[in-house]
Amino acid sequence: GSGTTAHAVMQLNAEDGGSRRFICVQLSEETDEKSEARKAGFNTIAEIAKERIRRASRQISDGLQDGSEIDTGFKVFKLAESGFKQWRQPEQSDTEALQRELSLNIDSVLSETSSENLLYELMLRMGLKLTCKVSFSDDVYFVEDEDTGGLYAFLLKRVDQGLIDAVLAKQPVKVAALDRLFEGDDALKSNTVLQMRDAGVMFECV
């Protein structure tokens, strides 16, 4: 819909100091071409909902008294194709096609995929909720599992020995890194695997 549920939840939290959450689901349904919404620049109902939530957030925050604060932030997710390349199995007898496919998958990430999109896709693969607390520090995404309290680290920007040491110091339960970030440095990759194992940290290279 147009975000009425989100508006009501934020308003109620402002009134009684609650910390309720909301989830709104909307198909990308287009607005009527002759509607006032379309004239105002809203091509889909989802766009209307997002703008309503933004305006409601500002209105509610501006109306708070005595320095009170509530969290009126929200995230927007859209269904999309994977950010990782999909392996296409060639015919067994076609060695040239197999070689081409191997070359294409040296880097498993699609070039146009953002780090944030990769992060949330990997979170879903690992069974982490989209509502988990996410922070970004020193080129590392940290995700706190709201159910177990476990810390997950995602290396999606760069990898070097100093960064590995800094991540391990935070005692995560699991670390995931993009394979391409090792840039063919097998020694660094092997040392990383050994360090993670010695520290009792699960490690995944993607």
Q: Model segments located where?
A:
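Accessory, often C-terminal, charged low-complexity segments
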Residues: 11-206
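Walker A/P-loop
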Residues: 1-8
